[in-house]
């Protein structure tokens, strides 16, 4: 996921590729990033850039997040540094316990279509200002669609993305309520209309239960 995000960001207008540093644990992954765009700052095992980064996106396995933060993100850093985790199952409370209360923290749930700027990304934040919220939304919005939600809704949002379930597209399939689970009905069409973001409307329409006895 980290590589997909870096590749997507390198092709949008928010950042210059040379201002994006991608840290890998394996040299083979570093070579892949360099092959995609030599201007990206791809390194292997060098975390020194985290001390000066304005935005840090953590895209590692969930069980690695705590150690990474404690080892590389608890020292000197710029004021207003934003930390974004895209690791599944990591809560804002955990991030705050490991990283501290004095920085903006976010959990984001993108999908791999982010590489081609067609992701639907759900985001929740803590200790953040409105300006920081707008910045993070702009970043992920440049990579598809982005929506700021309450943390309790990240689970349902993940299920929607994982199973490609878009019942709000078909009024009546849920008894006429116009929603699937606890996600707000408002914006459901915007979240679900693009096949490149994993949607399969025709298949879902066939699977949706019929109403009205037809």
Name every feature range the model reports, one short phrase each.
Residues 1-45, 118-119, 176-182:
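NAD(P)+-binding Rossmann beta1-loop-alpha1 motif at the extreme N-terminus of oxidoreductases
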Residues 201, 210-214:
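Extracellular beta-solenoid/beta-roll
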């Amino acid at each position: 996921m980290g590589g997909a995000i870096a590749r997507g960001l390198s092709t949008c207008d928010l950042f210059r590729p040379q201002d994006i540093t991608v840290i890998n644990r394996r040299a083979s992954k570093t070579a892949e990033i360099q092959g995609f765009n030599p201007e990206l700052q791809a390194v292997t095992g060098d975390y020194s850039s985290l001390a000066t980064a304005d935005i840090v996106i953590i895209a590692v396995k969930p069980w690695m997040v705590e150690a990474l933060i404690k080892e590389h993100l608890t020292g000197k850093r710029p004021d207003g540094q934003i930390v974004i985790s895209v690791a599944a199952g990591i809560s804002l409370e955990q991030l705050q316990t490991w990283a501290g209360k004095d920085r903006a923290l976010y959990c984001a749930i993108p999908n791999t279509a982010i590489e081609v700027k067609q992701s639907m990304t759900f985001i929740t934040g803590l200790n953040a200002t409105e300006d920081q919220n707008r910045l993070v939304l702009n970043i992920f919005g440049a990579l598809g669609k982005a929506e700021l939600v309450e943390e309790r809704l990240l689970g349902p949002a993940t299920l929607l993305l994982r199973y490609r379930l878009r019942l709000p597209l078909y009024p009546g399939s849920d008894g006429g309520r116009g929603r699937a689970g606890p996600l707000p009905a408002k914006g459901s069409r915007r979240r679900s209309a693009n096949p490149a973001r994993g949607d399969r409307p025709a298949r879902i329409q066939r699977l949706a239960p019929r109403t009205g006895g037809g």
